[in-house]
UniProtKB/Swiss-Prot annotation:
A GO term, aspect molecular function: catalytic activity, acting on a protein
Record organism: Lactococcus lactis subsp. cremoris (strain SK11)
UniProt keyword Nucleus, yes or no: no
A Pfam family hit: tRNA_anti-codon
InterPro entries: Aa-tRNA-synt_II (IPR004364), aa-tRNA-synth_II (IPR006195), aa-tRNA-synth_II/BPL/LPL (IPR045864), Asn-tRNA-ligase (IPR004522), Asp/Asn-tRNA-synth_IIb (IPR002312), NA-bd_OB-fold (IPR012340), NA-bd_OB_tRNA (IPR004365)
Location(s) in or outside the cell: Cytoplasm
Protein name: Asparagine--tRNA ligase
Gene that this sequence comes from: asnS
Length: 447
């Protein structure tokens, strides 16, 4: 209805009579007063109902009946509420509504998520309702702000949206982590990444980006992993590895700034330390080579505050190693030039050191781990063909990808950012399952 306002905008209507469409999240009161906690998807705030005011407006009989109806409203009843906006210095939100009229739209009976503590599995079983809570609303607002900031960044920097397919006949990353399905008698796979297709887009259109769901059949139960998540991939021609890192750093800072600008209420709800987020914007990201990172870990492995296992040159990092490194530097940190042995086939070797590749993982501080993976791509046809074979892949499946190197190939690079990991990091929350509306994990496919 065009005459409704959102709760988040009541600050612009102090002293005015407004109408709000909302749900009753909670209710309390006694005697002649009732306090309603209202939510509408933008914010939560309090509406105050004073029985004498209802009687004054509607008369003794009707006013009393309306007040009694309000006293018996159940959790999640939907309502139209009319009243006068007042400042309220006692609440974090800063405003409340002095109710003059309330109309019930839809009743709610036996709402399962009552205002008490519930176990995580119960809440996930009722995820379709858990999304209505203040914390989950804030998480979705942070997610939305990051998506909005992504599109804004790419538009301002000359990128074109390029949609890669969800179904593919080949793997972009690790063939052991593919979801396979029947495709009219042939095998097809759910996309792990749009990157290979973005390379084709970059050779046709210049700077391109893609945003969509990707799928990894990882049998992992950590707080950082989902089997279905959303990835923001970008690819750009005529760009080297170091230049790509500059773009990635600017992008991540733009995302954080976008949340600070457009989801401040959500961050306050989540009790996020925004001074830390501002620090990440104001401070240059660190860039550390893989080998220097290994040396650093070895030098500190016997410190009292370390809890990671010993690593050798050639080993991949585990979560404890990533956490320690990023906390050591205190800002987002690029680990560059990993061993080729455990990175993807399409990455270009470091000049003069074929055992290392021109790639980087961006590690977020505060224990959030990798949020971006990127690399400069191999442009030599013969070297790429050999790497495909060395990885045990069938070159025929990559004929079209190899052909990109035949017709005017240029230096190019790109990266992928996991949306849910970025949301978790910016929101300052513990588990990635709260960063997506309906999480898909190794033990959960419903609701």
């Amino acid at each position: 209805m065009k005459d409704l306002i959102s709760i988040i905008n009541v600050k612009d209507h102090v002293g005015e009579t407004v109408k709000i469409g909302a749900w009753v999240a909670d209710k309390s009161g006694k005697g002649k007063l009732q306090f309603l906690q209202l939510r509408d998807g933008t914010a939560f705030f309090q509406a105050v109902v004073f029985k004498p005011n209802m009687i004054e407006k509607f008369g003794e009989e009707e006013g009393t009946a309306k007040f009694d109806e309000i006293k018996h409203l159940s959790q999640e009843t939907s309502v139209y509420v009319t009243g006068v906006v007042k400042e309220d210095s006692r609440s974090k939100f800063g405003y409340e509504l002095d109710v003059t009229e309330l109309e019930v739209i839809g009743h709610s009976h036996d709402y399962p998520i009552t205002p008490k503590e519930h176990g995580v599995e119960f809440l996930l079983d009722n995820r379709h309702l858990w999304l209505r809570s203040k914390r989950q609303m804030a998480m979705m607002q942070v997610r939305n702000a990051i998506i909005y900031a992504s599109y804004d960044f790419f538009a301002k920097n000359g990128f074109i949206k390029f949609d890669s397919p969800i179904l593919s006949g080949n793997a972009a990353e690790n063939t052991t982590e593919l979801f396979e399905t029947d495709y009219f008698g042939n095998s097809a796979f759910l996309s792990q990444s749009g990157q290979l297709y973005l390379e084709a887009g970059a050779m046709a259109l210049g700077r391109v980006f893609d945003f969509g769901p990707v799928f990894r059949a990882e049998k992992s139960k950590t707080r950082r992993h989902l089997t279905e998540f959303w990835m923001m991939d970008a690819e750009y021609p005529f760009v080297t590895h170091d230049e790509s890192l500059d773009i990635q750093e600017a992008y991540v800072k733009a995302l954080i700034q976008g949340v600070l600008d457009n989801a401040a209420y959500a961050l306050e709800t989540l009790e996020r330390d925004t001074s830390m987020l501002q620090k990440y914007i104001d401070t240059p990201f660190k860039r550390v080579s893989y080998d220097d990172a290994i040396d650093l870990l070895q030098a500190h492995e016997n410190d009292d505050d370390t809890d990671y296992e010993h690593v050798e040159h050639g080993d991949d990092f585990g979560s404890p190693h990533e956490t320690w490194i990023s906390n050591y530097y205190g800002v987002p940190t690029f680990i560059v030039n990993y061993p080729a042995s455990f990175k993807a086939f399409y990455m270009k070797p470091v000049p003069g050191n074929p055992e290392r590749v021109l790639c980087a993982d961006l590690l977020a501080p505060e224990g959030y781990g990798e949020i971006i993976g990127g690399s400069e791509r191999e442009t030599d046809y013969d070297l790429l063909l050999k790497k495909i074979a060395d990885f045990g892949l069938d070159p025929k499946d990559y004929d079209w990808y190899l052909e990109l190197r035949k017709f005017g190939s240029v230096p190019h690079a790109g990266f992928g950012l996991g949306l849910e990991r970025m949301v978790t990091f910016v929101a300052g929350t513990e588990h990635i399952r709260e960063a997506i509306p309906f999480p898909r994990m190794i033990n959960r496919i419903q609701p």
